[in-house]
Amino acid sequence: MALTKEIIENTIQPHGGTLINREVNAELKETMLEVSHSMPAITLNPWSLSDLELIGIGGFSPLTGFMNEADYNEVVENLHLKNGLVWSIPITLPVTEDKANELEIGESIALYGEDNHLYGVLELEEKYTYDKEKEAAFVYGTTDIEHPGVLKVYEKGSVYLAGPIHLVDRPKHDEFVDYHLDPSETRQLFYDLNWKTVVGFQTRNPVHRAHEYIQKAALESVDGLLLNPLVGETKSDDIPAAVRMESYEVILKNYYPENRTRLVIYPAAMRYAGPREAILHATVRKNYGCTHFIVGRDHAGVGDYYGTYDAQTLIAQYEDELGIQILKFEHAFYCNVCENMATAKTCPHDASEHLHLSGTKVREKLKNGESLPKAFSRPEVADVLIKGLQEK
């Protein structure tokens, strides 16, 4: 979808200044489908396929393809692209050494999904090896293979392919078709709604009461809220995206103003890179048209690998460069005395009266077959989660 000059001028500037679109038109798609059978080919795992999609639709603007070695090294070591633009996570295409040896620089490489469907074409400009231990240590802050993101690093091929991509076809996301909007479409949506300021919220968990509290606090000072849940690959013990999406529908319908909230999927894989992933999440939401982004406790964290507010500390160092306003919230809790949600800034009562909420605790209770108290979750949401996980 092409944006008009008026929309471009009246929505936040994309990261790097231009909203990238690498999706081919119908004529070129037909040509690429015909010639792809004669191209060397590789099969993308779900993680790489989601990266391909986000490059193609502009979610990862200004990237036009998978990173070359110069950009990769600069991102890993200094959180910037070679051109000086802030970028925190390497977006790369790994293959085995044997596969890399079959491919020649200058070739067009057909990119298939695990369903044997053609999704894209890579114009191969570069092949390079990388240090897995270094990538893990710099990006994830640990080399412990118990960390799900680090494990992915060690499992993937030892060579990266680089070059611009063409998005030939899109993963369907059939379950979420009503909520599948590209960055150009969300920008059009915000313009049509006359939202000058929009706060984005990233989540891979159901919306519990602490989430609701900080979202509504943010909504007091902006025109609209974009609830933008990640629906790509996550850990096996995370709540399935389809169940989460139903829970989002229920809570928005019953507890949020319809004219000031929108639900749109974020079709990315979860990296669990904590502070660095918080920067990526903010960057992507800027590309989707958000002017503000919420960073709460342990953003994009897993286990005890990151401190409670490490993500807030790191992203604050790059906020001016990012060009999106970061809204930092303390850990919210339910106070039995206040009989309401609060934070340490607003509640005077002893910690023994505080019920701390988290996605982990919600998952644990559901896994153990426990009911979710009203202080934890809206009853309609709890019903959806319990039913969905029983069916799973």
Swiss-Prot record:
Upper lineage is: Bacteria, Bacillati, Bacillota, Bacilli, Bacillales
Keyword entries, A-Z: ATP-binding, Nucleotide-binding, Nucleotidyltransferase, Transferase
Q: Reaction(s) catalyzed by this protein?
A: sulfate + ATP + H(+) = adenosine 5'-phosphosulfate + diphosphate
NCBIfam families listed in its UniProt record? PRK04149.1, sopT
- GO terms for biological process, alphabetical: hydrogen sulfide biosynthetic process; sulfate assimilation
HAMAP family (alphabetical):
Sulf_adenylyltr
Q: Which InterPro entries match?
A: ATP-Sase_PUA-like_dom, PUA-like_sf, Rossmann-like_a/b/a_fold, SO4_adenylyltransferase_pro, Sulfurylase_cat_dom, Sulphate_adenylyltransferase
Say which species the protein is native to. Staphylococcus saprophyticus subsp. saprophyticus (strain ATCC 15305 / DSM 20229 / NCIMB 8711 / NCTC 7292 / S-41)
- The portions of this protein that span the membrane are none
The EC number of this protein is: 2.7.7.4
UniProt pathway: Sulfur metabolism; hydrogen sulfide biosynthesis; sulfite from sulfate: step 1/3
**Name of this chain's protein:** Sulfate adenylyltransferase
Q: Which family does the record assign?
A: Belongs to the sulfate adenylyltransferase family.
Q: What class of enzyme is it?
A: transferase
